[in-house]
């Protein structure tokens, strides 16, 4: 049995972490902490456990084995490192942290304390993405030559706990990034996972097109971005993100391989389609991708993966020691946009 505490009680905790822990038979929820105590109390009332007065009280509770870190991006590293140093296993929300140095310090703290540190890169776990990875590794359709992927929705203000344009997601000191990292890390990590290689270079442009604070001033981070990337093995393609896709969420990935075109979540019935070089199509009906509209459903797989990795003391597909290499692309995107140039990734 894994005894867990949850730090930060916004929407991602309520709709995903707490809900999925609650439905895992190997978990006991010990309690919650949030700076707004009423949020913590509401989740304790719904899912069980108690409310902690401070984050230190929670991470120093000897009855807690592991924690979820679901605070604003700027506090991921500080909170995670405190928890690891207190002897807790940690599942941290994405993006991992706001600088490479923070990410490295998190990984180092996990190693020093011999604790598991996983990052919520849930797209690695969808049945379609996992099967796509398997197909690519078999070589049945050849290697990936190029790719296109996009992720867009109407913005975090409709999803966040405040339901307001005053959300921390729009503030640079709390979020550090905009759509490029909030959404882009999902796709930057996914493509790296599928291609099976590390990025070589990136050119990124990030803009504010539509989002405003309640007083009418533009938000402090991007609401749209476009990235052109190349892998060390030569694979080349684009990642685009948007918080201004109004109507329905859009997530589509296309991989152009030596022997066909692989389409992921492009068709409402078949989540994976490969149009082969002879024009015939292999179609696979696997799943429907989870969106922010799919609230309170125990289906992301992240919590189950975290719990089993800790209880079985095994490596995980979500280990921070690997995800940090995807974060290198995020930081290179920031540099590229700021310097208006292509950036080579070490």
What do these predicted regions represent?
Residues 189-270, 300-314:
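Contiguous beta-strand/loop segments that form the cofactor/metal-binding neighborhood of enzyme cores
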Residues 105-123, 142-146:
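Rossmann-fold dehydrogenase core element
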Residues 1, 6-7, 27, 66-69, ...:
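C-terminal helix-rich "cap/oligomerization" subdomain common to oxidoreductases
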């Amino acid at each position: 049995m894994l005894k867990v505490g949850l730090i930060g009680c916004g929407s991602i905790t309520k709709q995903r972490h707490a809900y999925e822990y609650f439905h895992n038979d190997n978990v006991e929820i010990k309690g919650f902490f949030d700076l707004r105590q009423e949020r913590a109390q509401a989740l304790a009332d719904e899912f069980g456990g108690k409310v902690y007065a401070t984050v230190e009280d929670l991470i120093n509770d000897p009855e807690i084995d592991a924690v979820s870190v679901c605070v604003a991006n700027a506090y991921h590293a500080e909170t995670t490192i405190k928890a690891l140093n207190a002897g807790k296993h940690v599942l941290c929300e994405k993006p991992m942290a706001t600088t490479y140095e923070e990410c490295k310090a998190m990984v180092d703290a996990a190693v020093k304390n011999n604790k598991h540190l996983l990052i919520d890169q849930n797209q690695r776990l969808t049945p379609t993405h996992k099967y796509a990875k398997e197909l690519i590794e078999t070589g049945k359709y050849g290697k990936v030559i190029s790719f296109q992927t996009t992720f867009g929705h109407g913005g975090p203000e409709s999803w966040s706990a405040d339901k307001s344009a005053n959300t921390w997601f729009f503030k640079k000191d709390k979020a550090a990034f905009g759509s490029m990292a909030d959404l882009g890390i999902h796709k930057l990590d996914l493509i790296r996972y599928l291609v099976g290689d590390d990025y070589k270079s990136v050119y990124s442009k990030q803009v504010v097109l539509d989002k405003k604070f309640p007083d009418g001033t533009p938000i402090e981070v991007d609401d749209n971005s476009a990235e052109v990337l190349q892998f060390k093995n030569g694979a080349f393609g684009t990642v685009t993100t948007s918080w201004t896709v109004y109507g329905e969420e859009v997530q589509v990935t296309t991989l152009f391989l030596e022997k066909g075109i692989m389409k992921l979540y492009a068709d409402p019935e078949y989540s994976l389609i490969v149009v082969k070089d002879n024009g015939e199509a292999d179609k696979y009906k696997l799943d429907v991708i989870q969106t922010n509209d799919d609230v309170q459903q125990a289906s992301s797989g992240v919590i189950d993966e975290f719990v089993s990795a800790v209880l079985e003391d095994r490596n995980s597909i979500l280990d921070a020691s690997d995800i940090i290499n995807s974060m290198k692309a995020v930081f290179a995107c920031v540099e590229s946009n700021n310097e208006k140039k292509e950036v080579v990734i070490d």
